[in-house]
Amino acid sequence: MIRIAYLLSQYPAVNHVFMLREVRLLRKQGFEIHVASIRPPDRDLGALTSVEHQETQSTNYIRSMPVGRLVAAHGYTLLARPARYLGGAVRGWRLAGFKGLLYFGEAVAVGDWMRRKRLPHVHTHYAATVGLLISHIFPVTLSITFHGPGEFVNPAGSHLGEKVAASLFSCAISRYGASQLMAVAKCTDWPKLEITPLGVDLEEFSPRPFRPAPSPFQMVSVGRLAPVKGQHVLIAAVERLAKSGHCFVLRLAGDGPDLRALQQDVHARGLSECVIFEGNLNQDQLRGLYRQSDVLVLPSFAEGLPVVLMEAMAMAIPCVASWVDGIPEIITHEVDGLLIPPGDAEALANAIARLMDDVDLRQMLGQRARAKVLEKFNLERNVARLAAVLRQRLPGDGAAVGR
């Protein structure tokens, strides 16, 4: 059995629910997965689903580690591997200054936990710098899943080439992501790259009843409330729809630093009656919201391979999204969804109005969207693809080569 440490930035988390699905399916595939999370869950335990709550019971939360355990981890590692320990501190400082020293401290905590559990390999999502330092200090191998888009904006500052070089292999969730890694990695490291798309559970996200004449028309947008997600463009677009006499409700699911500014924008435009802020929703609540929705809108300025699009499309909800980064790998314009130039409120309003006014188009795009997810973003099939990569790339027992 291959034994792996999964190092995640925050687990479970509303915005990273795909990680929970991936971990649980890999276990069903026969892998022994032990999860370490840098931060605790993003919600109180009472707001978690039963599955999420179950996962917290076996997860090692690094920033909640008792001080005594942390001191013991550092003391043991310094005595057992002094050169690697001190070299890890120096490398952390070089990578990210004072923040890099925090990453170094976390790396020692995770690496010592791996030593005690005899875990020879660490795979990381959203914690690649900590993973890099673990592989420097401890005799373990490293693999990384890169999501984007943030880390692709400043690849030198994110040290992407160095991380790919240090890894046994690295995964991109889209062809776009793989191209960005190829742009910064040495060509001799290109054979390390794998494309492992995300996916959704097609039974959990089954088609919702189609509504030919909704009143009001229900729109939903799901994602962190942050400037990069483009929600202000969506607010400007729906103002145009309101002025043209369309009857609708827009529900924004998510939370984030832009909440107050978005609320003020909605109020200033006189849209408070038709724009509702739902806050963070767990998966059960989100599926309920999808079932009430006639269209999903994702007006982002940058994206990796957004799972929210896959979820909505799996439920036969037509989608309107920005033509950026990995999104065209999910939606083919006017075949199984509509794509618009990022930042163009007029184009976004026109695309939504097309779906409001054309019942046949709305139904056709929803049906084709479901078919696209069945073909390319089936969760079990895509996790099986990742499992095949792990089996091919790791030794039979997952053991790392010592140093």
Give the predicted meaning of each segment.
Residues 318-321, 331:
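Short hydrophobic beta-strand element within catalytic cores of glycosyltransferases
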